[in-house]
Amino acid sequence: MVRIFHILKDDNPTEALAAISKEANGPDRDLSVLLIQEAVRLHPDLPVKIYVLEEDAQKRGIASEFESIHYEKMLDLILSSHSVVVW
């Protein structure tokens, strides 16, 4: 399973992004990755940053537009973010 932290830098994300976030919490998590990739491609101006754990990225060959980080840094990222959706 790909573990992605979807960081919303804005307190009021767009409806489209909210819908994608809702879908990402559903049972088809691989599909949610594709939806998020598409959202970033179509709306590059949205305040979105997606992080993938390095070990998951290596195992699954995650697309290069995702930024991978070490697991140890994940807690700091969560604590410093306005809101985080995890799936």
PLM region spans:
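C-terminal structural segments of small proteins and small subunits
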Residues: S64-W87
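Short internal beta-strands
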Residues: D30-E38, H43, K49-D56
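Active-site regions of enzymes building and remodeling cell-envelope glycoconjugates
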Residues: L46-Q58, A63-E72
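Structural motif
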Residues: I7-D11, I36-E38, W87
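Short, flexible loop segments at the rims of nucleotide/cofactor-binding pockets, characterized by
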Residues: L8-D11, S32, G61-E65
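Short, charged/polar "capping" segments at the starts of alpha-helices
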Residues: P13-A16, A39-P44, K59-R60
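Extreme N-terminal starter segment of soluble prokaryotic enzymes
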Residues: M1-F5
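Histidine-anchored nucleotide/phosphate-binding helix
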Residues: D11-I36
